[in-house]
């Protein structure tokens, strides 16, 4: 009998790294040529940020952050274990990992093999230390659910959603939005036994191919003025339609399904109103209304 559990998690900041590395993105941003010099000046930073940096370059705050997130993910994992799903559908963005010049769908669900593995420290971590002190050849073992993926894709297409799907990766084993989600949900490394269906979304839209994902947009020159923009990401109303259709399909399925929305929490919330990246202001406005 169909049952649905909804959960929300973050797949960023860089919780994969030891606490000493949690300020890495912030420091990278300060070196970026596309960030205004005035915003790199500590004199312009709010007191909350300066307090977190403290006199140890943010290490104490990073330890508190790591402990909090670890406990939060343990709590979410317990909810998931108590529900004991037949399948776990995870929404996340693809940042030029498999959505590249050869194909950029708005959405794509992944019906991977019943047993597959990913080597997160070999594929994308660049040899950096990780929080769990795992070697480069350590493998995250996961399970796909192709039958459920086919059921979901079929139901979406029948409801007017032109759903792309794939049974194997095209360029990268798995987008970090999904890899990090599964790493964090298995914080204590007891294994992740539930079959998964990653559901990739083109959140980068017009900037995906030019920026090539990640933080590259902070370093690359702007698009030439005479070059036409790439198509946008799916609009919010379409995302709502897709989400509603997913709920309808799974409600009519034989599966106990956990639906997990995986995103990144704002890295600029405490920077308002002096933002390193002004385009993040709408996200802060939304946060203030919650």
Give the location of each predicted region.
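Active-site histidine-anchored catalytic micro-motif
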Residues: 3-290
């Amino acid at each position: 009998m169909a049952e649905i559990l909804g959960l929300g998690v973050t797949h960023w900041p860089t919780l994969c790294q030891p606490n000493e590395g949690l300020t890495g993105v912030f420091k990278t941003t300060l070196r970026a040529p596309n960030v205004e010099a005035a915003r790199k000046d500590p004199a312009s930073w709010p007191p909350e940020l300066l307090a977190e940096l403290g006199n140890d370059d943010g290490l104490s705050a990073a330890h508190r952050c790591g402990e909090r997130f670890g406990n939060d993910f343990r709590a979410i994992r317990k909810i998931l274990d108590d529900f004991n799903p037949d399948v776990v559908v995870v929404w996340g963005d693809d940042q030029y990992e498999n959505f590249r010049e050869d194909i950029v769908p708005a959405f794509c669900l992944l019906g991977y093999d019943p047993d597959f593995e990913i080597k997160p420290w070999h594929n994308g971590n660049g040899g950096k230390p990780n929080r769990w002190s795992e070697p480069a050849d350590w493998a995250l073992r996961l399970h796909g659910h192709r039958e459920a993926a086919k059921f979901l894709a079929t139901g979406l297409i029948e409801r007017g959603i032109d759903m792309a799907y794939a049974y194997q990766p095209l360029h990268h084993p798995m987008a970090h939005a999904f890899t990090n989600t599964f790493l964090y949900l298995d914080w204590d490394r007891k294994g992740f036994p539930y079959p998964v269906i990653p559901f990739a979304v083109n959140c980068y839209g017009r900037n995906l191919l030019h920026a090539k994902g990640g933080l590259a947009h902070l370093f690359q020159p702007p698009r030439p003025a005479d070059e036409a923009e790439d198509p946008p990401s799916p609009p919010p109303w379409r995302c709502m339609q897709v989400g509603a259709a997913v709920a309808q399909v799974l409600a009519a399925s034989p599966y106990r399904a956990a639906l997990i929305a995986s995103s990144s929490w704002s890295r600029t919330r405490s920077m308002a109103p002096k933002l390193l990246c002004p385009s993040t202001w709408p996200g802060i406005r939304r946060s203030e209304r919650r």
